[in-house]
Amino acid sequence: MKALRTLTILFALALMCLPAPSAAAAEKPFKLDICAMPEHESFIFWYAKEQGWDKDEGLDFQIHFFQTGMDQLEALPAKQWVVGGTGTVPILVGALRYNTYLIGIANDESWVNAVTVRPDNPALKVKGWNPEYPNLLGSPETVKGKTFLYTQSSSQHFGMSEYLKALGLTEKDVVMQNMDPAQVLAAFDAGIGDFAGIWPMWLYIGMERGNKLIYQPGDVNAVLTLTLVGDKAFCDAHPDIVVKFLRVWLRGVNMIKKEIKNPKLAEQYHRFWTEWAGQDIEPQMAKMDLEYHPVFDIDQQLAIFDDSKGPSQVEQWQDKVLDFFASQGRFSPEEVKKIRGSGYINGT
């Protein structure tokens, strides 16, 4: 995978400098099956298809809707897709059981796997208890013994554990109540719990109802990402197609970075959620979700995948998440070893 990944990124970088091939000059477009979830990263696939960017590269995006990352993986043996976007845990399970590669970072989810509180929570008034994170709110005194609503073994659970760690606490120092995110919001609205671990779109609904952000994993450099995933056999056989796929992806990234404050982009993002994802969300929530998901351009991708001086940032991020889920019993020690030795990131 190291050769593939280097080839892919460098070709994408080189091709960025060349004019895109016209659809008229291309032969019959290559039908590319893409897995997508109702998540931010799928917007680029959808928007690229809407704009005809796939045709510019001689591709024909066939975007397949999956509700979860695990649903995606279960469809892979039948080759229902060969590239796409997936989540934190599925990329690890894919490396373990489905022969997948991590071929890029789709976005940074560190700002949306958040913890919210009610406006009168005393922890909001304490800032900088940990000098390593001067903007972090809360302290051991204002958090210890309190009730946290959360979804066990989720990416948000990982983020919440990092919050407690930054305050010198563990889950044993608080009361943890496990429920799904919709139940978290309903329970918190009913006055249950002191801290609510939650993610979009329930996060934004709660904020509109007056809940306050007290913590986002990015506050303590706990990075959570969504990833671009590829079927190993396909990627090894068709690196040129992977390059073209990434070129379309990077075109979308550049567009988002340039137009992030443009109301018309927010309108398109809202249309994506209502028409493709099938979720009737408020326009303001769509705008927030778009702005809360930083994306990585080619220079940033090269930087975070650079392993010339040791493990890359991507490897470090993935290892930290893997360690957490292993501690939760999601992966056995043998499975952790297999994932790390699979070469799913850089072929080592």
Language model region names:
Residues 8-19:
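Bacterial N-terminal signal peptides
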Residues 20-25:
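Sec/Tat signal peptide C-region and signal peptidase I cleavage site
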Residues 183-278:
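Pocket-lining segment of extracytoplasmic ligand-binding domains
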Residues 237-330:
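Secondary-structure end/capping motifs
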Residues 321-348:
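Long, low-complexity C-terminal extensions of enzymes
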